[in-house]
Amino acid sequence: MSQPPPPPPLPPPPPPPEAPQTSSSLAAAASPGGLSKRRDRRILSGSCPDPKCQARLFFPASGSVSIECTECGQRHEQQQLLGVEEVTDPDVVLHNLLRNALLGVTGAPKKNTELVKVMGLSNYHCKLLSPILARYGMDKQTGRAKLLRDMNQGELFDCALLGDRAFLIEPEHVNTVGYGKDRSGSLLYLHDTLEDIKRANKSQECLIPVHVDGDGHCLVHAVSRALVGRELFWHALRENLKQHFQQHLARYQALFHDFIDAAEWEDIINECDPLFVPPEGVPLGLRNIHIFGLANVLHRPIILLDSLSGMRSSGDYSATFLPGLIPAEKCTGRDGHLNKPICIAWSSSGRNHYIPLVGIKGAALPKLPMNLLPKAWGVPQDLIKKYIKLEEDGGCVIGGDRSLQDKYLLRLVAAMEEVFMDKHGIHPSLVADVHQYFYRRTGVIGVQPEEVTAAAKKAVMDNRLHKCLLYGALSELHVPSEWLAPGGKLYNLAKSTHGQLRPDKNYSFPLNNLVCSYDPVKDVLLPDYGLSNLTACNWCHGSSVRRVRGDGSIVYLDGDRTNSRSTGGKCGCGFKHFWEGKEYDNLPEAFPITLEWGGRVVRETVYWFQYESDPSLNSNVYDVAMKLVTKHFPGEFGSEILVQKVVHTILHQTAKKNPDDYTPVNIDGAHAQRVGDVQGQELESQLPTKIILTGQKTKTLHKEELNMSKTERTIQQNITEQASVMQKRKTEKLKQEQKGQPRTVSPSTIRDGPSSAPATPTKAPYSPTTSKEKKIRITTNDGRQSMVTLKPSTTFFELQESIAREFNIPPYLQCIRYGFPPKELMPPQAGMEKEPVPLQHGDRITIEILKGRAEGGPSTAAHSAHTVKQEEIAVTGKLSSKELQEQADKEMYSLCLLATLMGEDVWSYAKGLPHMFQQGGVFYNIMKKTMGMADGKHCTFPHLPGKTFVYNASEDRLELCVDAAGHFPIGPDVEDLVKEAVSQVRAEATTRSRESSPSHGLLKLGSGGVVKKKSEQLHNVTAFQGKGHSLGTASSHPHIDPRARETLAVRKHNTGTDFSNSSIKTEPPVFTAASSNSELIRIAPGVVTMRDGRQIDPDVVEAQRKKLQEMVSSIQASMDKHLRDQSAEQAPSDLSQRKVEVVSSVRPVNLQTGLPEPFSLTGGTENLNTETTDSHVADVLGAAFATRSKAQKENSMEEPEEMDSQDAETTNTTEPMDHS
């Protein structure tokens, strides 16, 4: 058989109802050759035309003419997209593309044909509902599903009701993969046949083969799609066919006795069953006799086509199947005319897959020419004229125009979904997603829908299903059962770490996101998925994953972006945000408030909504105040006065001097960009021709530079040389624009802008002409407070002078912050010195006293404090806080990307770049923007979990804070410093009284974690009360005893004792003798043990104990001397405070973590090498007074996978190993 020629090019699709080319630029994009070289590289965006999807799509203007939707999987022509426009801010889009390209992350896996959604329905979704449609119908009055027998329509749906229906595909869906044109090779195989049909229809393409899934039910899928366009009735068709054969078996046997043996009919009937599975090796399936039976079930003819060569052959590869067992008068529709035939075809020469041929909506009904009308199968040929209305030329019309409306079909599906939920307790769309992500992705095919439904239901009940908020992909928290049994990975890890496992403890495995309990009867670990949490998406590795309920809804956290579109949000992301069970257009603004009543002081944070499109969602000041007072002072007599005070406080906080001033609460991931979901912003449209990642203050050799041409090298050199000059020109231009910008709005014309909350009265916006004085509360970072009255015309420099008079702080040492979150009040730009400060009556400002600046005259000092970076201020003065936040987010995104490319976590990569923690670095800038810089202020970063940092004003940098030892400069060897200090501090702890530890007996150190006894509580542990802050939403917060911090702060500056490695050289003879033994190793200053873990000589132990006592005495003596010297330098006003510090500092240092009982000196250092990223053991113990030598770093052992243990009653699933 000769291979047919390739198909001719397809005609262009018809224009959409609303042409997106609304501007000359977009019109040029559609015309070839009408674009310049630069504009050919533009990026366009548009929305998916599917009304149930409408995802935002991005594509190059010169790219493919068809775009695949990243949300529903459909492929659309560019002309069919809605709202096509040029993207003027491609940065985020390119950033996402770069991430995907370099990491090989394509987001959610490509949707296969079963999961492509059209009008919100996928093929697999329809398959799941089909068994329900065989027994249920929809009540027209209520729209709810009812059993057919309750509607007096029998037990089984009668498919003859679909005898006059035909599906016509929408033109925009013709090329949708999995729904439109079949792509299994049928277009090539049927090319000649389709060309003949096309010529018979005035050269118009009006009958096309469409896709059906090849899952063993392709015949009934093809018939169902030809009838209603969906695979909804495959189950009913099979049951109808089986029932039809059983009821008319005698007639069939008589009609086909010459062709089909009587013994075959049992197999033929069994093959109709929906659950039929053919015996292994037996090629059974639906065939011609079943097509003939379906024609009689539907009361309409079915035409089977093949390639021209197949139709001309002697085989039964094509035929016309007539409903010959049904009287012709019963094969008519409501209009009295004969039901028009439907058409199916073979998809390949293998003839093992059926596909339907359907017409196109809006085009003429397809006609099949006489020469392609096959002979009748199984019945006399003259019956064709009896059951098919032939045209004058001998052809016939295919299908007809009576289609089920999409609106009715969606109502029918929604009614069946309710029944599915009632029967199985899970939504069919969720089952379809489980099949996509957990079966198809692993190559598992042929799994019955019942099995997938049961597996999905169990995963939901076990809290193992999570959905990514960015990609919408499902992830499963699953651990192989063999890992939890004896000999398994996790079982052995728990056994080796904690010894005998106990049923009253929970065992945490942070690297596997798993918490387990122990079953002593079965001797296995049992996963507790209620306490376990999946922390990253299995597809994109993002952290925005949330649990999924059985109905498919997501268990959102406050601040999460939902899938609901928002039209009036100020945040600009285009979606609503979840907060306390409701969906809002915006994230709330947050501000602190203090309640005082009856000697009790309570501090709370108020979350305020004020810009909602639905006014009922706006916060009501009286409701908020009443809830606060009722929450903390329930039933208090006379609390109405407190309510009124709270109302006034909230009104002061929410009164807007500028209606556009919107500073929402910072939620990590709340505005994370989804795939194809980025909104364009106003930036330069010049697109980069190369994408290059650069680090701060470092030169990076890029991949593109390896094969650069000479011209490219010259251009790059010119750009490098001219960059500073161009930047300076740009800065000067911005200065001139700012200086020459006229004020076009008269103060008298400013209207009062009331709040959008009807029940919440607000103040009028700030107006410089108001005659009222403004009272401002000022607080310094050393604890002083005052109320200052300002005139309406008070300028920045007058405010500085008022602060200097009130607190005796020179202007050059003042850093003024206002608003929430606090932001620095910058000095006025050139020419605007007389402008009043943007403060309102009732505002609060904070004064940060700068340190380490050279004192000078007031004028020069003020210049050094605020105007050193005037060029930078001129450039960045116009940037909003949102833009600054986006810039920091992009820097962090690039850092995370580079860390992933290097195969390291963020901390391991960042510690090798100390400049990131110094002035100008990304972490330094985040802390400065969010909370301000003050010496000794602590903070944490969500990208560096388990790490606490402190600002060192003298060095102007961030340093790593380790709970028990002090602060360390960031560098590649900082972990070595910490681990060395862990050994030293542990050795010191052996000399202290075990009873002096406040948490004695509650914690035990293990090689991989901490075990908490289930029956005991940590009542006597004091939480951290210092200046610690969390930037964003970190996963955990260290808790530090202030007494230990005061003590260790003194120890850090102590110079009386040398803790370096050199001190071991001057040990007494007993240690010299001990060290001469090749088996003795040093685990801390003055502490040695046996390498093989055996006990050493008791005399040596006693000598070690005495030596440690001498060291502690020396330390305490040095502390006393240091404190006496320090106290002598302090002012008399601070004397009482210093006495308290001396008492707390010279008190023996108590570690918050108890030691194993009994504590053995033979523990070895290898078991202490745990990662501080996942375990807080090093954070509890660690300090670094000496630098690990190079040899130690080279000989350090590989750290074992670690695990933790926690109380079974602990509910903190985010950080199972919390410590105090």
From Swiss-Prot:
Q: Where is this region: Disordered?
A: 1-40, 724-778, 988-1008, 1113-1140, 1185-1220
Enumerate the catalysed reactions: Thiol-dependent hydrolysis of ester, thioester, amide, peptide and isopeptide bonds formed by the C-terminal Gly of ubiquitin (a 76-residue protein attached to proteins as an intracellular targeting signal)
What EC designation does it have? Answer: 3.4.19.12
For the modification N6-acetyllysine, which residues carry it? Answer: 407
- Start-end of Pro residues biased regions: 1-19
Write down which residues bear the modification named Phosphoserine: 746, 756, 767, 993, 997, 1076, 1196, 1205
Q: Which residues form the OTU domain?
A: 207-360
- One MF term in the entry's GO annotations: cysteine-type deubiquitinase activity
Q: Where is the composition biased (Acidic residues)?
A: 1197-1207
Bias class Low complexity marks the residues at 20-35, 754-770
Q: How is it modified after translation?
A: Phosphorylated at Ser-1205 by ATM or ATR following induction of covalent DNA-protein cross-links (DPCs).
Chief location category: nucleus
What is reported when this gene is inactivated?
Mice were born at nearly Mendelian ratios, although the birth rate was slightly decreased. Mice display genomic instability and premature aging. Cells show an accumulation of DNA-protein cross-links (DPCs).
Q: Where is the active site?
A: 215, 218, 353
Q: Which UniProt keywords apply?
A: Acetylation, Cytoplasm, DNA damage, DNA repair, Endoplasmic reticulum, Golgi apparatus, Hydrolase, Nucleus, Phosphoprotein, Protease, Thiol protease, Ubl conjugation pathway
Assembly with partners or alone:
Binds VCP and the ternary complex containing STX5A, NSFL1C and VCP.
Q: What does this protein do?
A: Deubiquitinating enzyme involved in DNA repair and reassembly of the Golgi apparatus and the endoplasmic reticulum following mitosis. Necessary for VCP-mediated reassembly of Golgi stacks after mitosis. Plays a role in VCP-mediated formation of transitional endoplasmic reticulum (tER). Mediates dissociation of the ternary complex containing STX5A, NSFL1C and VCP.
Q: What's the protein called, per UniProt?
A: Deubiquitinating protein VCPIP1
Question: What organism does this protein naturally occur in?
Answer: Mus musculus (Mouse)
